[in-house]
């Protein structure tokens, strides 16, 4: 499973990229709005930092306008992936983008059949939302597993991005249940590195070393 970071903050992206594990970036209008910067310029900045796919979301809800927006986004850099909501109009846009050779990430997926529809329309990626399903008492991992099984049975190459990741257990379970990618906020990425026993081990090694230097 690959790691993407879910942010529009350049510093967070640069820090994650230095870890050597970052394979891509996902953004959304809310994340860019928090940064208070021009949307297209920020996507350009991100693409200059990261070589992997960078998802940039359309704002329009009508297919023709999504297509116009997506074409402009795709011009920013070759690694831009146009992010499209899972709607009837979104599927129309995904088909058009697929015909144009523009990669897409279908977002706000909450059922296996939505993922299948998106894949058949030509989506490069589908993004099931784990945390939001958990919030309403559903098991997001069941959805990841269902999508992975359906894609495997039918030889579908669309990749599954586990989104709305809240904690390290989500990351582990997504990997176990067949997600190709997990897109993760910066604070969760930081938490993945840490374990209390690792910290204790380092402290013990240092203490033991200091004792040898006192002799």
UniProtKB/Swiss-Prot annotation:
Pfam families (alphabetical): TAL_FSA (PF00923)
Uppermost EC category: transferase
Reaction(s) catalysed (UniProt annotation): D-sedoheptulose 7-phosphate + D-glyceraldehyde 3-phosphate = D-erythrose 4-phosphate + beta-D-fructose 6-phosphate
Active site: 83 (schiff-base intermediate with substrate)
Coiled-coil blocks: none
GO biological process: carbohydrate metabolic process; pentose-phosphate shunt
Main location: cytoplasm
Known pathway: Carbohydrate degradation; pentose phosphate pathway; D-glyceraldehyde 3-phosphate and beta-D-fructose 6-phosphate from D-ribose 5-phosphate and D-xylulose 5-phosphate (non-oxidative stage): step 2/3
UniProt keywords, alphabetically: Cytoplasm, Pentose shunt, Schiff base, Transferase
CDD domains, per database record: Transaldolase_FSA
Gene3D superfamilies named among the record's database cross-references: Aldolase class I (3.20.20.70)
Signal peptide: none
EC number: 2.2.1.2
Molecular function as annotated in GO: aldehyde-lyase activity; transaldolase activity
A GO cellular component entry from the record: cytoplasm
Places the protein is found: Cytoplasm
General function of this protein: Transaldolase is important for the balance of metabolites in the pentose-phosphate pathway.
Family: Belongs to the transaldolase family. Type 3B subfamily.
NCBIfam families membership: fsa_talC_mipB
Protein's name in the database: Probable transaldolase 1
Organism per entry: Bacillus cereus (strain ATCC 14579 / DSM 31 / CCUG 7414 / JCM 2152 / NBRC 15305 / NCIMB 9373 / NCTC 2599 / NRRL B-3711)
């Amino acid at each position: 499973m690959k790691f993407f970071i879910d942010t529009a903050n350049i510093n967070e992206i640069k820090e994650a990229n230095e870890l050597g594990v970052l394979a891509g970036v996902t953004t959304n209008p809310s994340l860019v709005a928090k940064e208070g910067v021009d949307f297209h310029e920020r996507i350009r900045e991100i693409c200059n930092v990261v070589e992997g796919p960078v998802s940039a979301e359309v704002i329009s809800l009508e297919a023709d306008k999504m297509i116009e927006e997506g074409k402009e986004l795709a011009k920013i850099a070759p690694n831009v992936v146009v992010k499209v909501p899972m709607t009837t109009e979104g599927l129309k846009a995904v088909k058009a983008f697929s015909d144009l050779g523009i990669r897409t990430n279908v977002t706000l997926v909450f059922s296996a059949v939505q993922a299948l529809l998106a894949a058949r329309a030509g989506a490069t990626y589908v993004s099931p939302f784990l945390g939001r399903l958990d919030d309403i008492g559903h098991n997001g991992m069941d959805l990841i597993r269902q999508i992975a099984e359906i894609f495997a049975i039918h030889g579908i190459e669309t990749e599954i991005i586990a989104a709305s990741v809240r904690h390290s257990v989500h990351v582990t379970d997504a990997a176990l249940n067949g997600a190709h990618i997990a897109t993760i906020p910066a604070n969760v990425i930081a938490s993945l590195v840490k374990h209390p026993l690792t910290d204790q081990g380092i402290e013990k090694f240092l203490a033991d070393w200091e004792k040898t230097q006192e002799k």
